[in-house]
A protein has these predicted regions:
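Solvent-exposed edge beta-strands and adjacent loop segments
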Residues: 1-102, 148-168
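Short beta-strand and beta-hairpin "edge-sheet" elements
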Residues: 77-79, 130-183
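Beta-strand secondary-structure signal
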Residues: 100-104, 172-176, 223-226
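Short, acidic/charged, Gly/Pro-enriched secondary-structure junctions
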Residues: 106-147
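Extended Gly/Ser/Thr-rich low-complexity repeat segments
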Residues: 116-126, 188-196, 202, 236
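Surface-exposed beta-loop interaction hotspot
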Residues: 181-216
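Beta-strand-rich structural segments
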Residues: 210-235
């Protein structure tokens, strides 16, 4: 059984001060693996400053790119009840329940954004969470490496909800994290304003903004040295 240590155990004492993880305020989506087969993650040996994350967000290789979400609200992050087996009215643990994650986006919600989110559904995607306390939250199953939470393929679904007389236009996104994600492996990087050095999160991840898709028109005024081409946002 997962996390069951036969013949030994874990001490239950705690230090006088323990870190707390704030509620999610943003997500950072990325593919699990790059096209070169290398896992996308953050390491304690990385210098986690502005240039590092700007490079990931603007990465020309989309398999290694980081996709920040907008501000997320009405977050529901719950793990379901465990799967058990009943024998003689005794419930035996079989496996942990699924961890589902639901959120809404109000600022910037549009049908075009719904389409952008749903394009990720069939891909092997992962997501870091960014807390209101500017922490990047992920999985530290292996010491020194913070991995994004793996998303079960084909569970990510975005639904556009039009505005009404009493409610704003918004986007609702739901997903299920992989059964391989264990809550006991959750860890995070704390933001340290003015910090320097390897493994120090020296830039506020709440400030991250994703790239914006554009539609390119027909080139005109073409010469040896220049041309003009109109570009418009897909959002109008």
């Amino acid at each position: 059984m997962s996390n069951c240590l036969c013949g030994t155990g874990k001490n239950l004492g705690q230090p006088g001060c323990t870190g707390k993880i704030g509620r999610p305020q943003k997500g950072l989506l990325t593919r699990r693996l790059g096209n070169d087969g290398v896992e996308n993650n953050l390491k304690l040996t990385d210098v986690l400053g502005s240039s590092f994350f700007t490079g990931l967000i603007n990465q020309s290789d989309i398999s290694k790119r980081l996709y920040p979400t907008g501000t997320i609200v009405n977050v529901v992050d719950e793990r379901g009840d465990p799967v058990t087996y009943n024998a003689d009215n005794i419930e035996y643990f079989s496996s942990q329940g699924n961890r589902t994650f639901t959120f809404e986006i109000i600022d910037g919600a549009s049908p075009q954004l719904e389409k952008a989110y749903n394009n990720f559904r069939c891909q092997d995607m992962c997501m870091y969470l960014v807390s209101v306390d500017s922490q990047i939250v992920g999985n530290e199953r292996n010491a020194g490496i913070l991995r994004p939470f793996r998303i079960e393929k084909n569970t990510l679904y975005a639904k556009y909800i039009p505005a009404t007389a009493t409610t704003p236009e918004r986007l609702m996104v739901t997903l299920t994290f992989s059964v391989l994600e264990k809550d006991g492996d959750i860890s995070y990087f704390n933001y340290t304003e003015g910090g320097t050095g390897a493994g120090v999160l020296a830039v506020n991840p709440l400030d991250f903004q994703g790239l914006v898709d554009v539609t390119m028109g027909t080139a005109t005024g073409i010469s040896v040295t220049a041309f003009t081409i109109p570009m418009t946002y897909i959002y109008g």
